[in-house]
UniProtKB/Swiss-Prot annotation:
Signal peptide: none annotated. The gene is vatH. Belongs to the V-ATPase H subunit family. Keywords: Hydrogen ion transport, Ion transport, Transport. GO terms for cellular component: contractile vacuolar membrane; pathogen-containing vacuole; phagocytic vesicle; vacuolar proton-transporting V-type ATPase, V1 domain. Subunit of the peripheral V1 complex of vacuolar ATPase. Subunit H activates the ATPase activity of the enzyme and couples ATPase activity to proton flow. Vacuolar ATPase is responsible for acidifying a variety of intracellular compartments in eukaryotic cells, thus providing most of the energy required for transport processes in the vacuolar system. One of its GO terms (molecular function) is proton-transporting ATPase activity, rotational mechanism. The lineage of its organism: Eukaryota, Amoebozoa, Evosea, Eumycetozoa, Dictyostelia. This is V-type proton ATPase subunit H. It comes from the Eukaryota.
Length: 445
């Protein structure tokens, strides 16, 4: 899936939808003319004239008092007309009343037709095939909300999810976005989360997220993708299944690199859902998320949900760190970059008991220590500790110097002239220890 050069000639972006909705609702539909031509009955005319162009509060009151009549009028008129402007208008009214009063979706789900077992879903399914992006989007939103409130057949559910999957596999960003928005409404219901996961939808969303993470960022599409994943992770089994897939690493990277607050908020909320599921905690720690959380915790945020999520994540991961072995705590410190002169660095016992563990994951910890020495942004404290610990590894591991040469070239000589006295001392001390180590080796020969 390539999001680098997406065709956006068709479809409708969510960011544009609000503007389009206002344009559609500004239309003057000639209800009086329909009544005069007997296209609608006088009762239907009275019904719609008391509703259309009124305030939200008035619409809510009118709909609640006569919901069955309004539902039948909206759906049957859409089903009987070919006028795209009227179809768009009525779809917008349907989604509007469901937004004003979510209970309205239940009223739409109860409408039936003797010769159509799929009614009213069949009406909206036909609109999904229209060559009109606005109609596709608003028909899919209405259909998803009505399905969540009703009891659709298995065939209807499969048909709708298959339509969504086709959109999610497109290279057209706007079509993908329509699929995501329709999906989000469905994922409010746990049965639909499970269904979507069973048809490999969870993996498909992760693929989209990974593709977006490696291209020039389409913020709105990124937001819609994370939003869908966030809804999925309210199911504990799905949250646990995401462990080990790379989702945690992707979300942590987005928190680190994307400045948009809405992306940070949604990424943190998703990570909060993943907390304590599978090996997600370990993945967060291994990806240096603890350090990132501490940085985020001192920032001021416009959204109150962000500090709340940060607090939950910090406290949740702190419990895991407390339960870690001394080596795992040490590894977490090195990988996160939050280096301090904790007792383990200078503990002879620690180095003797844990030296073989430095071989794990292809010398992951050693490579991180090397990276600290190479990075110009490393602080004097980080450089000092990295020099010290690499030296201790060479001193305690039987093949330490050879491994250091294989994994990376040591760079102590580049740092012993640094202006910082602590770094200079640690680099010189490291060289002395390494030379002593070689001398002891030669004497043993």
């Amino acid at each position: 899936m390539n999001f680098r050069e997406l065709d956006t000639s068709n479809g409708v972006k969510a960011a544009e939808s609000s503007f389009r909705t206002k344009v559609v609702l500004a239309r003057e539909i000639p209800w009086n003319g329909f009544a005069s031509s007997n296209s609608i009955t006088s009762e239907q005319y009275n019904l719609i004239s008391k509703y259309d162009k009124h305030t939200d509060a008035e619409k809510k009151e009118k709909f609640a008092a006569n919901s069955a009549s309004y539902v039948n009028f909206f759906v049957n008129f859409i089903n009987s007309t070919s006028n795209i402007e009227i179809i768009q208008y009525l779809l917008t009214l349907i989604n509007e009343i469901i937004e004003i009063d979510p209970r309205a979706a239940g009223a739409f789900s109860k409408i039936t037709k003797d010769d159509d077992k799929s009614y009213p879903y069949s009406v909206f399914f036909r609109l999904l095939n229209r060559e009109d992006a606005y109609t596709n989007l608003h028909a899919s939103i209405a259909l998803a909300q009505i399905m969540c409130a009703g009891k659709p057949t298995q065939n209807d559910v499969e048909s709708f999810f298959n339509w969504i999957l086709k959109l999610l596999r497109k290279n057209n960003s706007s079509e993908v976005e329509v699929g995501l928005i329709a999906l989000q409404s469905l994922l409010l219901k746990d049965d639909f989360r499970i269904f979507f996961n069973n048809i490999d939808g969870s993996a498909l969303l992760l693929n989209i997220l990974q593709a977006l993470s490696t291209s020039s960022v389409n913020i709105q599409l990124l937001y819609e993708t994370i939003y869908a994943i966030w809804l999925l992770t309210y199911n504990k089994d799905i949250a646990a299944a995401y462990s080990g897939t790379g989702l945690v690493a992707n979300l942590v990277q987005l928190v680190k690199t994307v400045a948009k607050e809405k992306i940070v908020r949604l990424s943190l909320s998703t990570l909060r859902n993943l907390l304590n599921n599978g090996k997600s905690n370990e993945e967060m720690i291994d990806n240096g998320f603890v350090r990132m959380l501490n940085i985020l915790n001192i920032k001021k945020w416009g959204d109150d949900d962000i500090p709340a999520d940060i607090e939950v994540l910090i406290n949740g991961l702190a419990k895991d760190i407390d339960n870690m072995s001394s080596f795992n705590k040490y590894k977490t410190e090195i990988i996160s970059g939050e280096l301090e002169w904790t007792p383990v660095h200078k503990s002879e016992r620690f180095w003797k008991e844990n030296i073989s563990k430095f071989e794990e994951n292809n010398y992951q910890v050693i490579k991180h220590l090397h990276q600290i020495l190479k990075t110009s942004q490393s602080t004097p404290l980080q450089l000092s500790i990295a020099c010290h610990d690499l030296c201790e590894f060479v001193r305690h591991h039987s093949r330490g110097k050879a491994i250091m040469t294989i994994t990376n070239q040591t760079r102590y000589h580049g740092y012993d002239v640094k202006s910082n006295e602590e770094v200079k001392n640690q680099a010189l001390f490291a060289l002395q220890k390494m030379m002593l180590n070689n001398w002891e080796y030669l004497n043993a020969k």
